[in-house]
Amino acid sequence: MTEKTIRRQSVSRRTLLSGTAGLLGGAALSSGTALAQNTAPASTSAPVNSPASPRSPDPAWLALRQEEIIEPGLEIVDPHHHLWDHSGDRFLLDQLLTDTNSGHNIAQTVFIECGSMYRADGPVEMKPVGETEFVNGTAAMSASGRYGPTRLCHGIVGHADLRLGDGVARVLEAQTVAGDGRFRGIRHSVTWDATGTLPKARTNPIKGQMYDATWRAGFARLAPLDMTFEAWLYHPQLLELADLARAFPQTTIILNHVGGPVGIGPYKDTKAETFAQWKTGIAEVAKSPNVVVKLGGLGMLFGMFDFHTRETPPFVVGAGARL
């Protein structure tokens, strides 16, 4: 279940896909492909069933729940995983293979940027190209067939700083070359919160980042190159994303983690209000046909459900059931 890798949290693909509608108050959500979305962000303290490192998995806890493989013949493209080598948490080719060989029919995977293996020197704006070079090497290893039929990292989504405006064009060109036919688009995370208490992305976004004229000038460079934009934000920013989608109808926007409904900090005891705000925002985003949504990320530590505090990993009996 490869999207355990964003921070290697504990809830399975089956749980997240079948339980999304129920968890979000019965909202009608659907997906045309099986999406592996099993994520949790870093936290400042270790939760009950997590090891000391917020990035690290807890294999013993995960092993407490063994789920039946559903439709093992169904061909799946995993649209969201990472690769990294952090202190106490390595998730590279071998670990990815463990997940993709768990019994599901994973045909291909898509790598999503996570700040790994940036270039150590050279122009600052070009350092993210190192990540693509690294991932493309992993993809080439997989394409050799030595590691089985799954084509790992067959698509690569990297990073380019859209705050460069028109200047981002040279970074996108370099990313395309480094990807050797696999580069598909970028993610420039814009997670920002008015309370200032939620984790911010390494991009250090500002209030109204997606309205910024220079940022939008950079964004405008994506469509001519047929590149997608992966949107990672918090639910109060959904209306901002809807405006962006209307302004750039030719750019495909892929909304990460169901629009980021938050359940920590000042949002911990306001789930009803959060759902209402999320529902309004996601409905507005849905009006733009150039936006698609990844169903998942509900196990992330910023979310509303505190799965990581349970004695055993959660399990969904039927679609729409509450955990």
Where are these regions (language model features)?
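Short acidic/histidine-rich active-site segments
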Residues: 253-257, 294-297
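Boundary at the C-terminal end of the N-terminal hydrophobic targeting segment
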Residues: 34-36, 42
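Active-site gating/metal-coordination segments in enzymes
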Residues: 48-64, 123-237, 243-247, 259, ...
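H/E-rich (His + Asp/Glu) clusters that bind or coordinate divalent metals
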Residues: 60, 262-323
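N-terminal export leaders
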Residues: 11-27
